[in-house]
Regions:
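Transmembrane-helix motifs of polytopic, lipid-linked glycan transferases
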Residues: 78-95, 134-138
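Soluble catalytic regions of membrane-associated enzymes that act on cell-envelope
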Residues: 277-450, 458, 474-495
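Membrane-interface micro-motifs in multi-pass membrane enzymes
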Residues: 31-35, 49-53, 73, 77, ...
Length: 583
């Protein structure tokens, strides 16, 4: 009966974790998958296995590549964490069969759950932790000290080579276990951490690994350019604390009856409180919306981006996604002011050299038709990815090199993607464009983007963001996105002088055969008292009538200036007039 109750508990934990992660972390797993590029080739896998911690790296890469599939990321993570909890509980039971400290068994698992939400954490750390637990469970099954010590020695060496820094945690755990169990000649086990320390020192000495923290600490399972938050150490601390407490309480009088029930309930309550507080502190809910928009961009679900942007926001990243979605739908200049706007940075955020912003800017530049800038940002995002590249940015590099006719480079990236699980079919479909200008030029996407290529080279934004856009539009008049971005840029900056020049120069041409809604509203501002000027640019009667009502209400409420913005927003918050006057 006890056996089945334990299985039932683990099933309940798995189901709970899966449902929870499915609801609150679905888009996080999609982003984690984008942070690595795992190739299913012998050369790639052997290269990883030759590194300290290589097997954990390969196993985690194999698992994470499936995170692109709906629900799979939540399922794999829930299954792995539940398995770790069950394994550690079995270890504690092996140390003290009468142990009722289920709290201690699940604290390391909760700590590992919290660190999963860190975008810069590598899943390898969780896999390596599981490998360490498995080794500990097997070694503790050996009753005699000397055989157990020999097995521990081999396990330490194997863990160092296959799992990385967890080998030191394993070695220290065995020393602690032997000491607290008062094993005769327990101090022989001190050789275990000594050997790990010597191996680690040699790795640093001969530049196999760059820093000691990557040899002995869980920092190795984090993006190497950053210093991890303290939460990454919690699982190690909780694990060792649980081991110490269980060893010290071994052979103590076991609680029974109501005391045992009360102990179990109190432990579950404590675990629940820790879970709730940990999710609040480390759940990364502030960045979750950004991860969601990144996924919608990747899958071209522009309407879902716009739905998520209906609520007012001051976050320039959200606005950048929003305006890109409008541009992709061809309605940026018509509907930009139906959504929240806060200046020109909502069109193009500043580059901070991070992989996330680089990927976003690559998408924005590609939307504008700026192939050179899109390629540069894709390259920056790709080389800055956590593990060997970013699949989507590698796809972008395939596209941009095909557009440029740099077929050998494109072929190299295609070959990489052909070695992956999810992207191989897409990559194979791109081979028809290699060394085939006609196929590229007749393709709706690649051909149109090739027509955006400028005849002369220019440094990006050397003459200004708007100048680059106008050059692109002049090069390819069918590229409406670039021209609309330029016009909306002037409107968001309230640069009416340049906007006037833009309209008067290009109205009636292929670039601007008619004015979009926001441009018509802005033309009225250019010459508020000259209706003939409006007619010159084809401002519709409905917009003229709406402006008349707008002006009348502004004049009626001018004596109540504090309340006027709120009053006008109700009826005219979707107009450029409101933005120009009140923002």
């Amino acid at each position: 009966m006890k056996k089945y109750s334990g299985v039932a508990l683990h099933v309940i934990v798995f189901v709970f974790l899966f449902i929870f992660l499915r609801i609150f972390s679905e888009y996080h797993f999609y982003c984690v998958e984008q942070n690595q590029l795992f190739q299913l080739t012998p050369f790639f896998i052997i290269d990883k296995l030759m590194q300290p911690g290589g097997l954990a790296m390969v196993l985690s890469g194999c698992l994470v590549q499936f995170f692109i599939l709906p629900n799979v990321g939540a399922m794999i993570t829930a299954a792995l964490l539940t398995s770790l909890g069950a394994l550690f509980w079995a270890i504690l039971k092996r140390i003290d069969p009468r142990s009722h400290g289920i709290l201690w068994a699940w604290l390391p698992v909760l700590s590992l759950l919290f660190v999963q939400w860190d975008f810069n954490y590598r899943f390898q750390g969780t896999v390596a932790f599981g490998m360490m637990l498995l080794a500990l469970y097997l070694v503790l099954g050996i009753r005699n000290f000397i055989p157990r010590l020999i097995a521990s020695l081999f396990a330490s060496l194997l863990l160092f080579g296959l799992a990385g820094p967890v080998s030191l945690l394993f070695a220290l755990s065995m020393v602690g276990y032997e000491a607290m169990s008062r094993t005769p000649r327990w101090y022989y086990s001190a050789i275990l951490p000594m050997i790990v320390l010597i191996l680690g020192g040699l790795c640093v000495r001969y530049s196999v690994i760059g820093e000691y923290r990557f040899v002995f600490l869980p920092d190795s399972y984090y993006y190497f350019r950053l210093v991890p938050d303290k939460v990454i150490y919690f699982s190690w601390i909780a694990f060792y604390a649980a081991l110490v407490v269980t060893c010290l309480c071994k052979n103590k009088e076991s609680w029974a009856g109501k005391k045992r029930l009360a102990l179990g309930i109190s432990q579950f309550i404590i675990l629940g409180l820790i879970f709730w507080k940990g999710f609040d502190l480390y759940g990364e809910q502030k960045s979750y919306r950004l991860k969601m928009m990144d996924y919608f961009t990747r899958t071209e679900q522009w309407d879902r981006i716009l739905v998520s942007c209906k609520e007012p926001t001051t976050n320039q990243l959200y606005l950048c996604y929003q305006n890109m979605a409008l541009a992709r739908k061809g309605i940026l200049a018509d509907e930009a002011f139906k959504y929240t706007q806060h200046g020109p940075r909502g069109l193009m955020v500043a580059w901070n050299k991070s992989t996330t912003i680089s990927a976003l800017l690559s998408d924005v530049y590609f939307t504008m038709g700026n192939v050179a800038a899109a390629q540069e940002m894709a390259f920056e995002s790709n080389i800055g990815a956590l593990c060997d590249g970013n699949p989507r940015m590698t796809q972008r590099l395939v596209q941009t090199n095909l557009i440029y006719g740099a077929y050998p480079v494109a072929e190299k990236y295609i070959a990489v993607l052909e070695n992956t699980f999810y992207y191989k079919d897409w990559a194979k479909a791109q081979r028809k464009f290699l060394y085939n200008d006609e196929a590229v030029e007749t393709d709706p996407l690649l051909g149109n983007m090739r027509r955006n290529l400028l005849a002369e080279n220019h440094l990006i934004q050397m003459d200004g963001f708007d100048t680059d856009l106008i050059r692109l539009a002049e090069q390819n008049p069918s590229n409406k996105a670039a021209f609309h971005y330029a016009g909306v840029f002037y409107l968001l900056a309230k640069d009416m002088t340049r906007f006037k020049t833009l309209v008067e120069t290009y109205y009636g041409t292929d670039l601007l055969p008619s004015l979009p809604v926001s441009f018509q509203e802005a033309v009225i501002i250019l010459s508020e008292k000259d209706p003939d000027y409006w007619k010159r640019f084809g401002v519709s009667e409905s917009i003229v009538g709406r402006f008349t009502d707008y002006k009348r209400q502004v004049l009626a409420g001018r004596n109540n200036s504090n309340a006027l913005p709120g009053l006008m927003y109700r009826s005219y918050g979707d107009t450029y007039w409101y933005y120009y006057m009140f923002k």
